[in-house]
Amino acid sequence: MHESIKIHIGRCQMFLLVNIIGLFIFLGIGVIFSRNRKNIQWKSIFILVILNLFLAWFFIYFPWGRAGVKGAANGIAWVIESAHEGTGFAFKSFTSNKMMDMAVSALFPILLVVPLFDILMYFNILPKIIGGIGWVLAKVTRQPKFESFFGVEMMFLGNTEALAVSSEQLKRMNEMRVLTIAMMSMSSVSGAIVGAYVQMIPGELVLTAIPLNIINAIIVSCILNPVSIEEQEDVVYSIKDHQTERQPFFSFLGDSVLAAGKLVLIIIAFVISFVALADLIDRLIHLITHLIANGIGVKGSFGLDQILGVFMYPFALLLGLPFNEAWEVAQQMAKKIVTNEFVVMGEISNQVNAMTPHHRAVISTFLVSFANFSTIGMIIGTLKGIVDKKTSDFVSKYVPMMLLSLIHI
């Protein structure tokens, strides 16, 4: 018994050591590909890393932190129950079965959550929350005010929505700061989509992952694209002076519901299309490798997950996972980058509770963001409609760096 305890402690210490080494390697990769290594503000990076580690400890191990996250997750679940009531009123058969389809259980609640967030925006409640958290984050991390505010905006609004809301600010910023914002946008998550996430993986993991990913995004952008600004440039421009006349509430609410409906249809279309395309490519690769294997007298084949998993495997190992779990996570990470988070969440939703705590935390943190190939197109497209051609072309030139930030996130 004592021997087994010693072996378990030894393994934990080894994986913790690998985790620490992995942190330095990830930071090192960022430094190698940095646009301006001399300008990296290591004091801010150190503060951000410590803050991230503290939040991870607080939310996962500290009783008050765990209780807070659990309470918030239960609150979201309570709101989702109202969403299911709305779905059940229109489609009773959809919600009568405990095993609801993914679209019904995860995506239909968006029809409630998006208008709910928009109502909070309409009455200026959400902007005040964003401003307060952003101000604290800017003071603690010593980052420019807008970059900190934008990190919090992403946590509630999502990438394209946060960019659209911040359009006046982006028009006044230099191209290097806009690139920083584009890189940060790779790690965004929309508060309106959180309701969908918590239907597929435990809510406490989702809510823990969101702030960690936002801080990770700031760390990555500070290393890959360090920018120094003068004090007079560190200004957050108000959008109130540029707003059109305020819509009547029910007209605004109607537009919000329509936007939510379009969002649900878009996500369903993306999920169906990406799953189908990924499966087709996987089948073709299996067929080709099977024919090659038969030609050389070997049995077996491999597919898309295995190919992409090989590339992601070293990164998964550096996260302190055992070899077998690292291989599984590597394939899931690769599939999420190529398709989207909903595809992988749907696959692991029935397995996540059986995973080891560290395995569960790693995969949940990676999945809870919009970071994938299609996100790059969305960000570039949104920026083209906001900033001038010179700035959008500058950002487009650094797509490889955005891809690198995607892997770091």
Protein language model features and the residues they cover:
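Hydrophobic transmembrane alpha-helices of multi-pass small-molecule transporters
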Residues: M1-E3, H8-G68, Q243-I272, R283-L284
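Hydrophobic core segments of alpha-helical transmembrane domains in multi-pass membrane transport
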Residues: G22-F33, L48-I60, F108-I119, S188-A196, ...
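Short, membrane-interfacial amphipathic segments enriched in basic
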Residues: G65, S82, N124-L126, I239-D255, ...
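Alpha-helical membrane segments and immediately flanking helix-loop junctions
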Residues: V140-V198, A330-V399
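Transmembrane helical segments that form the transport core of multi-pass membrane transport proteins
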Residues: L258-Q351
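Long, contiguous bundles of hydrophobic transmembrane helices that form the permeation core
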Residues: I214-L263
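Conserved small/polar residues in nucleotide/adenosyl-binding loops
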Residues: I407-I409
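Hydrophobic alpha-helical hairpins/lids featuring a short glycine-rich hinge
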Residues: H84, G88-Q143
